[in-house]
A protein has these predicted regions:
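Adenosine-phosphate binding glycine-rich loop
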Residues: 1-8, 138, 144-216
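Glycine-rich phosphate/diphosphate-binding loop of Rossmann-like nucleotide-binding domains
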Residues: 4-97
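Short, solvent-exposed amphipathic alpha-helical segments in soluble enzyme
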Residues: 37-39, 59-61, 120-126, 149-152, ...
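Short gly/pro/ser/thr-enriched loop/turn and capping motifs at secondary-structure boundaries
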Residues: 51-54, 71-72, 139-143, 167-168
Length: 216
């Protein structure tokens, strides 16, 4: 992105802050909101789960909605597939936002399925030259129709980033956070002294694949 994130007032004129749209307000989306806000951007966010509105607002971002009530909350904090009417409404919202924002960051994933298509080629064409799309769902096929997994491309002046190795690009930090999660998981399971598998624990149950030879 070839401009300031934060707005600037200079003797030569005023530079407005960058406008960022984050699609999907899960862990990655909320992190993206925090990073963009920290750099001084104006941030908007969309998620099919109304429950995350408060989290988005608490981080200083505007929570966008469509005029169609439908809850996209799925299991494990992920979103579920939405109805055709809702998808059409959100597509119209993204097209309207594409005309205004400078950066779109997509993070939408559905467990066990390809990433939902949210940004069409038409939507990309509505963005100004110099704009950027960061597709964090590229490894699962991508939320943008033009994403090429593992590559960075330029489409009519719009840069589309489809990296599939984001954790590897920040290996020390990613490893430290992953290790920290494992330590807490094993401690919650009793540690070395009182190790046990509690099938009633939602976190443990979600991590189980086989138990006593039975596929969970």
């Amino acid at each position: 992105f070839g401009r300031f994130f934060t707005g600037q007032m200079t003797a030569a004129g005023k530079v407005p802050p960058a406008k960022v749209l984050v699609i999907g307000a899960g862990v990655a989306g909320l992190s993206a909101i925090g990073a963009a806000r920290g750099l001084g951007a104006v941030v908007r966010a969309f998620d099919t789960r109304p429950a995350v509105r408060e989290q988005v607002s608490s981080m200083g971002a505007e929570f966008l909605e469509v005029k169609l009530e439908e809850d996209g909350s799925g299991e494990g904090g992920y979103a579920r597939e939405m109805s055709p009417a809702f998808i059409a409404a959100e597509m119209a919202l993204f097209e309207a936002q594409a005309r205004e924002v400078d950066i779109i960051i997509t993070t939408a994933l559905i467990p066990g399925k390809p990433a939902p298509l949210l940004i069409t080629e038409k939507t990309v064409d509505l963005m100004r030259p110099g704009s950027v799309i960061v597709d964090l769902a590229a490894e699962a096929g991508g939320n943008c129709a033009l994403t090429q997994p593992g590559a960075v491309i330029n489409h009519k002046g719009v840069t589309i980033i489809g990296y599939v190795d984001m954790p590897s690009r920040l290996a020390p930090t990613a490893s430290a956070l992953y290790g920290n999660n494992l330590v807490h998981l094993l401690a919650d399971m009793g540690g070395a002294k009182s190790w046990h598998i509690d099938e009633g624990d939602e976190v443990v149950r979600g991590a189980l694949i086989l138990l006593n030879g039975t596929l969970m």
